[in-house]
Amino acid sequence: MTRLLMLLVRFYQRYLSPLKGGPTCRFTPSCSQYAYEALAKYGAIKGTWLAVRRVLRCHPFHPGGYDPVP
């Protein structure tokens, strides 16, 4: 399951994200890279939870910045 989720993130990074016309994430690493790293480090359940929390923080009213996977 983890590998499938990681493949979906890579698909998004490679084929869908470029359609947005440039970087739009407020964080470093980007939200999709954060999701990929969280899945690789923690597995499907905790990695998905961390990724969802991160995406919910990525909005115009949050300052963003450096936020690595714990």
Swiss-Prot record:
Keyword hit for Membrane: yes
InterPro entries documented for this protein: Membr_insert_effic_factor_YidD
Key words, A-Z: Cell membrane, Membrane
One Pfam family linked to the record: YidD
Subcellular location: Cell membrane
One CC-aspect GO term: plasma membrane
Keyword Cell membrane found: yes
Record function comment: Could be involved in insertion of integral membrane proteins into the membrane.
Family, similarity comment: Belongs to the UPF0161 family.
Source species: Symbiobacterium thermophilum (strain DSM 24528 / JCM 14929 / IAM 14863 / T)
Record-linked NCBIfam families: membrane protein insertion efficiency factor YidD
Organism lineage: Bacteria, Bacillati, Bacillota, Clostridia, Eubacteriales
UniProt protein name: Putative membrane protein insertion efficiency factor
PANTHER family: MEMBRANE PROTEIN INSERTION EFFICIENCY FACTOR-RELATED
Membrane topology: Peripheral membrane protein
